[in-house]
Regions:
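Short helix-loop "hinge" at the ATP-lid/N-box region of the Bergerat-fold HATPase_c
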Residues: 121-126
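Detector for a conserved hydrophobic position within an alpha-helical segment of the HATPase_c
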Residues: 190-191
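Conserved micro-motifs of the catalytic ATP-binding
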Residues: 60-65, 103-106, 174
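Conserved DHp (HisKA) dimerization/phosphotransfer helix of two-component histidine kinases, i.e.
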Residues: 20-31, 36-90, 94
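Acidic ATP/Mg2+-coordinating residue in the GHKL
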Residues: 154
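Glycine-rich ATP-binding loops of the HATPase_c
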Residues: 194-207
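Short beta-strand/loop element within the Bergerat-fold HATPase_c
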Residues: 133-146
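Short conserved segment of the HATPase_c
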Residues: 159-171
Length: 223
């Protein structure tokens, strides 16, 4: 089973990318049906192109390369922007608040897909809890021992008493209709990127006051 899951990770990662593109396509169809302004149609077509380009890039060149945390965050925010607005979620971008940038070694496409998956999880659980004001935070930290990390957090229900080992186990999910593979795939992507997925406790990292729910860190280990 483990061998099959490892072999499936690239394909499942592409599936996560296509999920983001599908949301843009839905918005594009809705815009055309209501006769939206041509500039809006053009904007959505451009977004769809940018969402699909990483898929073709991954298929052409799956090998790891060099990028930065800031670029990964920018790309992930771009792919999730429409969904965040649709669900009335306020984005707090730590990179606008002097969070440190750092170099990253790995597959840019897979890492962006991993971040997008974390954002998608936050959107889902924020809708489930439905607080009066919904917040999503994405930034970086050097507070976790072992290496710099990208942080995604929200003010949803959090992970409760779930064990971190269970959260990254394949087929473990509390999401109705979920496959239980999202965090497993993210963990595998981090493993091959010389990193790991971490679930910081309250007080482990510096976060905006609004972020009181789930917090996930993608840590790139120092070598």
């Amino acid at each position: 089973r483990d061998q099959l899951l490892h072999a499936a990770v690239p394909g499942l990662t592409i599936g996560m990318m296509l999920h983001g593109a599908e949301k843009i396509l839905d918005e594009l169809r809705a815009a055309t049906s209501r006769g939206a302004h041509p500039d809006r149609i053009k904007e959505l077509v451009d977004r769809l192109y940018r969402a699909m380009r990483p898929v073709t890039n991954l298929l052409k060149n799956p090998n790891p390369g060099k990028t930065s945390a800031g670029i990964l965050i920018k790309e992930a925010i771009f792919s999730a922007e429409i969904r965040l607005k649709r669900h009335h979620i306020t984005l707090i971008n730590g990179m606008d608040k002097d969070c440190p940038d750092f170099k990253v070694q790995g597959s840019k496409q897979m890492l962006v897909a991993s971040l997008t998956n974390l954002i998608d999880n936050s959107i889902h659980w924020l809708e489930t809890k439905d607080p009066k004001q919904k917040y999503l935070y994405i930034g970086t930290t050097e507070d976790i021992e072992g290496g710099a990390a990208i942080i995604v957090g929200d003010n949803g229900p959090g992970f409760g008493k779930d064990d971190p080992e269970d959260l990254i186990a394949p087929f473990f999910t509390r999401r109705a209709g979920g496959m239980g593979l999202g965090l497993y795939i993210v963990n595998e992507v981090m493993r091959v990127s010389q990193g790991r997925i971490v679930f910081p406790n309250k007080g482990d990292v510096d976060l905006p006051d609004q972020i009181k729910g789930a917090v996930v860190a993608l840590q790139f280990l120092e070598t």
